[in-house]
């Protein structure tokens, strides 16, 4: 049995893969693959409409929010967000992980050419991002602020800002990179001005980025780039140019699968259960360590851990691969191991990994 712990692209629900396989050569008796049909066809319009409606239902997205299906990966949003929201304003960044740092760096780069200010509220980098940054509201000028950007789940470092810990402001919008825990943790969309997420972790396959934006944040002023203008993209129903049709189709199937599992809250409960199995073993062990300082900040999607030495870490991932536990090697910037246990990852895979971890500890402690 193979268990894919990849951080993204990552495991997909078997039911979704089978449906893709079943329809690949003949989509809805059209005689064509879904990869071949026009994005302007009635058949594809139905696909994207259903995907949007299902996502709106799953996340209880209010009607005053627009949903976009875009290309470019979540990293493209590091530029699009300040270009659309921060002109003439101050953009604040909470840097608690490598991707938050990249988002801030991109805003700083844009500030050299555009009328905007990118302001870091601080960073936990000196501590290897092993905890989240506590936000000092006294540093924020809400009146002239565009937004506060944060990452809800740090895929590399294994930390999360859960719903109960989100900062609240009277008027400053929250912008969230939700790439690695969207649909895995139940967030109240109305708490955010804008949410974006790459699809290849919990939503489907690489090549698609979802953006959820509150209508009042759409910019009517002429922008630097039509392709990166939320207003234009909304007006064109995500079809200003040819969208990533196959990735949208797969995401739509994933949304239906999430509904069939009972929705986001049910999956969050299962994700907590899976993560707790690993954290319980790590906490009770003298062999394994989890570097996250505060237990209430531990991710339930990406569980990071180390053994007593780098040599043992390498041996662990090697032996794990031989046993069918794939992609457990930690990110190159952190080392150690990382078990990415997104929505589609089965509980039995975590149970089997825990057994293997116990056996490895017995053999090498």
UniProtKB/Swiss-Prot annotation:
GO terms for cellular component: cytoplasm. Pyridoxal 5'-phosphate binds at residues 74-75, 99, 155, 177, 200, 241-242. Its main location: cytoplasm. Binds 1 pyridoxal phosphate per subunit. The keyword Magnesium does not apply. Pathway: Amino-acid biosynthesis; L-serine biosynthesis; L-serine from 3-phospho-D-glycerate: step 2/3. One of its GO terms (molecular function) is O-phospho-L-serine:2-oxoglutarate aminotransferase activity. Its EC number is 2.6.1.52. L-glutamate binds at residue 40. Homodimer. Catalyzes the reversible conversion of 3-phosphohydroxypyruvate to phosphoserine and of 3-hydroxy-2-oxo-4-phosphonooxybutanoate to phosphohydroxythreonine. Belongs to the class-V pyridoxal-phosphate-dependent aminotransferase family. SerC subfamily. This is Phosphoserine aminotransferase. The gene is serC.
């Amino acid at each position: 049995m193979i268990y894919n712990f990849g951080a993204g692209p990552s495991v997909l629900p078997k039911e979704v893969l089978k449906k893709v396989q079943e329809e690949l050569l003949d989509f809805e008796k059209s005689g064509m693959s879904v990869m071949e049909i026009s994005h302007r066809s009635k058949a594809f319009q139905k696909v994207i409409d259903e995907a949007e409606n299902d996502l709106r239902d799953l996340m209880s997205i209010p009607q005053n929010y627009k949903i976009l299906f875009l290309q470019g990966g979540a990293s493209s949003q590091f530029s699009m967000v300040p270009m659309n929201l921060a002109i003439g304003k101050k953009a604040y960044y909470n840097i608690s992980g490598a991707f938050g740092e990249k988002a801030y760096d991109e805003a700083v780069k844009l500030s050299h050419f555009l009328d905007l200010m990118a302001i870091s509220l601080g960073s936990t980098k000196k501590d290897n991002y092993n905890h989240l940054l506590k936000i000092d509201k006294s540093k924020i000028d809400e009146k002239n602020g565009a937004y506060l950007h944060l990452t809800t789940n740090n895929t590399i470092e294994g930390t999360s800002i859960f719903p109960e810990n989100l900062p609240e402001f009277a008027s400053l919008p929250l912008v969230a990179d939700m790439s690695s825990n969207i649909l895995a943790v139940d967030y109240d969309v109305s708490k955010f001005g804008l949410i974006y997420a790459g699809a290849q972790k919990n939503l489907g396959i690489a090549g698609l980025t979802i953006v959820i934006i509150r209508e009042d944040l759409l910019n009517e002023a002429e922008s630097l780039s039509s392709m990166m203008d939320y207003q234009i993209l909304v007006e064109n129903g995500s079809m200003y140019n040819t969208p990533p049709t196959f990735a949208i189709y797969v995401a739509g199937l994933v949304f239906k699968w999430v509904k069939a599992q009972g929705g986001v809250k049910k999956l969050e409960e299962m994700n907590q259960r899976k993560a707790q199995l690993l954290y319980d073993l790590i906490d009770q062990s003298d062999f394994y360590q989890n570097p996250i300082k505060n237990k209430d900040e531990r991710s339930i999607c990406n569980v990071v851990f180390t053994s007593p030495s780098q040599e043992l870490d390498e041996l662990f991932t090697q032996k794990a691969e031989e046993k069918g536990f794939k992609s457990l090697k930690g990110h190159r910037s952190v080392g150690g191991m990382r078990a990415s246990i997104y929505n589609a990852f089965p509980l039995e895979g975590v149970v089997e990994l825990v057994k293997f971890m116990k056996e490895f500890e017995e053999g090498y402690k």
